[in-house]
């Protein structure tokens, strides 16, 4: 795999050298409200990181959306996976260092400073979200809350009022390996249905890829060669929790494959998003021309024939020079961004977009910043 490609992948998941440097933390206590009633942006400062404490509810303020991120994984089960297993687990930090040697041979990644097992990789994902948290916090004047279904200490937190009561936009990240058997309960489905009856709410569902679903070993190898990421095994199936969530909520979508986006030959940048702007009546993609590069992105397959059930707002061109079963079937693009506007008793929006759009330190482009800002202001 070319270094350029790995660095893009690494940045896409936040595996850049900057993840260990001090990061800006949100300080909601430092907010002030100026004369005239306009909301002041969140003051960002290098405050201390906290852990092992209960969430302090955020107060509702008109025009200041309260974002919550929900990692749908079982952290201990993911971190404790048998590293002799070839498939359906995250890489260890040691494996990341070996593949990209000597990029990570720095004091901040040494065993004295950073976890070397699978847990180290999971923590990189957490750190990779900070830029999005700070960017949205500046726009909304509200801190972004981050939850885990089962955290490092084995504390279980299903989706319920403890999360939803002070949330306007809920982001569910489907980075749980299917073998860990995370599924939404009937109570969680009911809680989300009730949440979406509240006007102005938004549910963003972000299941990641489903690589190697076929039992055919040759097909798995073709998928592996297509995305080219040495850290992704021949089978890595994510998102059972989000699949069960979508089924329970009547969202006719399934995450499939891990597809490599096409790039511009001269620059190596990802090709522009094929945006269906005539269907984007809310303006989610205003000022957005591209998402960020990631070598294995899911195709969000629509599983209904009803054209009114869901709108495909963005498609991404696939790298066609490296074969894949999906492209051999005649496909040249994959569904990257979908929207279900409010309908009937559901007053809230439902959006589908891959979680790597948010877990990135590469997201300093105007296009991606515009997308984040739109999510914070258009719902």
Predicted segments with their positions:
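Short, surface-exposed patches at the edges or C-terminal ends of soluble domains, predominantly
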Residues: 26-379
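N-terminal export signals
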Residues: 5-24
């Amino acid at each position: 795999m070319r270094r350029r490609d790995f660095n893009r992948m690494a940045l896409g998941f936040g595996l850049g050298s900057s993840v260990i440097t001090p990061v800006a933390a949100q300080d909601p206590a430092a907010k002030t409200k100026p004369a005239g009633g306009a909301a002041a942006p969140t003051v960002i400062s290098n405050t201390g990181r906290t852990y092992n404490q209960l969430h302090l509810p955020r107060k509702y303020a008109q025009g200041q959306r309260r974002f919550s991120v929900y990692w749908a994984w079982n952290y201990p089960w993911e971190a404790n996976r048998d590293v002799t297993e070839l498939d359906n687990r995250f890489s260890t930090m040691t494996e990341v260092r070996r593949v990209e040697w000597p990029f990570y041979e720095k004091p901040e990644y040494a065993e004295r400073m950073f976890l070397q097992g699978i847990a180290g990789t999971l923590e990189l994902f957490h750190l990779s979200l900070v830029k999005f948290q700070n960017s949205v916090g500046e726009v909304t004047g509200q801190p972004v809350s981050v939850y885990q279904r089962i955290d490092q200490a084995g504390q279980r937190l299903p989706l319920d009022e403890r999360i939803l009561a002070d949330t306007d936009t809920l982001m569910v990240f489907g980075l749980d390996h299917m073998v860990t058997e995370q599924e939404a309960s009937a109570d969680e489905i009911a809680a989300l249905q009730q949440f979406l009856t509240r006007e102005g709410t938004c549910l963003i569902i972000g299941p990641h890829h489903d690589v190697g679903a076929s039992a055919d070993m040759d097909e798995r190898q073709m998928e592996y060669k297509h995305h080219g990421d040495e850290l992704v095994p021949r089978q890595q199936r994510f998102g059972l929790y989000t699949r069960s969530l979508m089924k329970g909520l009547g969202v006719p979508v399934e995450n499939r494959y891990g597809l490599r986006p096409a790039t511009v030959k001269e620059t190596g940048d990802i090709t522009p998003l094929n945006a269906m702007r005539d269907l984007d009546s809310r303006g989610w993609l205003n000022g957005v021309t591209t998402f960020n590069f990631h070598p294995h992105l899911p195709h969000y397959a629509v599983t209904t024939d009803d054209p009114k059930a869901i709108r495909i707002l963005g498609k991404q061109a696939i790298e066609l020079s490296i074969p894949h079963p999906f492209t051999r079937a005649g496909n040249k693009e994959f569904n990257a961004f979908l929207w279900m506007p409010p309908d009937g008793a559901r007053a809230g929006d439902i959006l589908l977009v891959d979680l790597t759009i948010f877990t990135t330190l590469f997201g300093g482009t105007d296009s991606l910043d515009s997308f984040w800002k739109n999510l914070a202001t258009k719902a």
